[in-house]
């Protein structure tokens, strides 16, 4: 039966605060019409959205709700017994508003918008089944699974392998019997955690300029140290002798960068933040993009254009020593699974790929699972058309509760969920604060985007933002050769930041202060996770294993995820990785 606590909890689930007198009224109505609190609140939400523009309940509109809806059901009860022969309830926990008449009990249809319990009609000619799906959101229309995803034939296929052959032979084995005492922490930032209640975008121009200037100075000093350059001059200094200048790459127009539009902005200390056009005709090889900090050698005979001879951009530090902390060192082999959203196909909200991933985790029991958003993509058609009958946040909480149940089937698996600015229920800012949920699960930990994890001495960098694609759309490259994807990933390591592009892509809202405090990469990680729309890959770049698992779904079909096996040896570490189709 309904109680004040249950009714209050159900309203809070939808983010609604209700006065005590309304709570008492709801409890009495539940008792009068013999309905539980959850069903009552769901029916109220449907009625409110369709007739009251989503208004919160009060005594007056509750009376209207009862008069219009429950009186209909009371009038139909006299015919219920004769019409229910041969019908059995499905017991589905999924609420579907406006379900087809063929799967509804004739005597219980309140209206197309009312919450009803679908029935399975037993007839000889036609049999309609209604499968339950605890990962599907409440909706005003039934959600049908993707035919393309359901009929795929390459489930579990390994499409790419990398690393030590001996480890690859064991990478697919379950790890439930191999219990590791892992110590996992987030590598801290100087400014602490990102707060959800921060004033995002509140930027003073002089503070923003000072922050960028400080970043240019620091990165350019690292480049000088690595390249053996001793002294810098102003970007506007007139000289016929070869000099070195430092600054940030910019474009002279609001357009894509090209070799004739490159501008170099110097530091305040050396150049009073002045800019100078750059002539790259004499440079044999370079790879540049807006926001990149570089050091150039060349001449500037008139002070109006810097004729570059050589470009230096590598500020990457040394790879982190995996045994730097002897009290926190990996013992044995660690299994890791990495997956990136979206977690449902673009034509439905059934989250079948996520359920298959959960099944894989339950079977193989990896030590660590890293999942990057989005979980509820703001670009999904079902999100845009407003057919969900529950809040985005409440549905996300339901997804997390389902993941929390993995503690029963895979008790030693630790799940780290990295936020995404593309989630409909979260803040649209980068760097992105960590998620939060209504319930605490001991096996689930929320991380911001980006973040750096220390897993028993193994450093893992993670971001959910497609920085590889963003840089690719703005980069100009001459004479570099080699692999483009490795070069793009190398920019992140060499610039010591998860997002070196500035101005950012139009689809991304970047807070400059948060970027300076929380998007820096102070060390070269052993593993760097960079989900991207580019084809999946695993490559070693500057001593770091870069993993692009791609996405768990691709349109209406299935995608891929990555699995890794890391072993710590006396003198070195070994990493093996595979890309697997879901």
Predicted regions and their residues:
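Extended recognition/assembly regions associated with phosphoester-bond processing machinery
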Residues: 1-582
């Amino acid at each position: 039966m309904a109680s004040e606590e249950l009714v209050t909890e159900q309203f809070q689930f939808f983010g609604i605060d209700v006065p005590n007198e309304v709570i008492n009224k709801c409890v009495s109505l539940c008792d009068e019409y013999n309905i539980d609190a959850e069903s009552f609140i769901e029916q109220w939400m449907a009625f409110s959205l369709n007739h009251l523009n989503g208004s919160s309940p009060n005594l007056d509109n509750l009376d209207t709700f009862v008069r219009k809806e429950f009186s209909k059901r009371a009038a139909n009860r006299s015919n219920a017994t004769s019409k229910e022969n041969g019908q059995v309830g499905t017991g589905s926990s999924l609420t579907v508003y406006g379900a087809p008449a063929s799967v509804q009990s004739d005597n219980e249809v309140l209206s197309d918008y009312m919450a009803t319990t679908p029935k399975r009609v037993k007839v000889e000619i036609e049999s309609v089944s209604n499968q339950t799906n605890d990962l599907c959101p409440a909706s005003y229309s039934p959600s049908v699974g993707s035919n393309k995803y359901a009929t795929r034939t390459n489930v579990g296929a390994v499409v790419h392998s990398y690393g030590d052959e001996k480890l690859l032979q064991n990478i697919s084995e379950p790890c439930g019997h191999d219990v590791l005492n892992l110590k996992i922490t987030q590598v801290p930032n100087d400014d602490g955690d990102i707060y959800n209640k921060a004033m995002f975008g509140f930027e003073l121009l002089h503070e923003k300029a000072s922050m960028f200037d400080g970043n240019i100075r620091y990165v350019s000093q690292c480049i000088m140290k690595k390249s053996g350059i001793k002294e810098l001059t102003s970007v506007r200094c007139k000289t016929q002798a070869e000099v070195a200048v430092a600054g940030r790459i910019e474009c002279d127009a609001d357009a894509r960068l090209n070799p004739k539009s490159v501008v170099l902005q110097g530091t305040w200390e050396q150049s009073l933040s002045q800019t100078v056009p750059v002539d790259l005709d004499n440079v044999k090889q370079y790879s540049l993009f807006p926001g990149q900090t570089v050091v150039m050698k060349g001449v500037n005979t008139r002070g109006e254009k810097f004729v570059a001879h050589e470009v230096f951009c590598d500020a990457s530090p040394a790879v982190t020593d995996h045994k730097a902390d002897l009290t926190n060192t990996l013992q044995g082999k660690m299994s890791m699974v990495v997956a990136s959203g979206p977690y449902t196909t673009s034509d439905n909200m059934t989250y079948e790929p996520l359920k298959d991933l959960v099944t894989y985790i339950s079977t193989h029991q990896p030590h660590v699972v890293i999942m990057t958003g989005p979980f509820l993509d703001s670009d999904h058609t079902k999100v845009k058309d407003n057919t969900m009958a529950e809040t985005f946040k409440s549905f996300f909480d339901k997804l997390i509760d389902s993941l929390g149940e993995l503690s029963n089937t895979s008790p030693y698996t630790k799940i780290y969920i990295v936020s995404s600015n593309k989630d409909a229920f979260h803040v649209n800012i980068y760097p992105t604060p960590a998620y939060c949920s209504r319930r605490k699960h001991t096996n689930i930990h929320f991380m911001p985007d980006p973040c750096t994890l220390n897993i028993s001495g193994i450093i893992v960098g993670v971001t959910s933002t497609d920085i590889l694609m963003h840089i690719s759309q703005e980069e100009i490259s001459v004479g570099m050769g080699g692999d483009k994807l490795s070069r793009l990933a190398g920019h992140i390591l060499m610039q010591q930041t998860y997002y070196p592009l500035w101005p950012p892509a139009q689809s991304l809202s970047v807070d400059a202060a948060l970027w300076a405090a929380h998007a820096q990469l102070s060390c070269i990680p052993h593993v760097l996770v960079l989900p991207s729309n580019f084809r999946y890959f695993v490559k070693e770049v500057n001593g770091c294993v870069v993993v692009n698992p791609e996405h768990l779904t691709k349109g209406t079909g299935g995608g891929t995820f990555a699995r890794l096996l890391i072993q710590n040896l006396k003198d070195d570490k070994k990493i093996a990785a595979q890309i697997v189709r879901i």
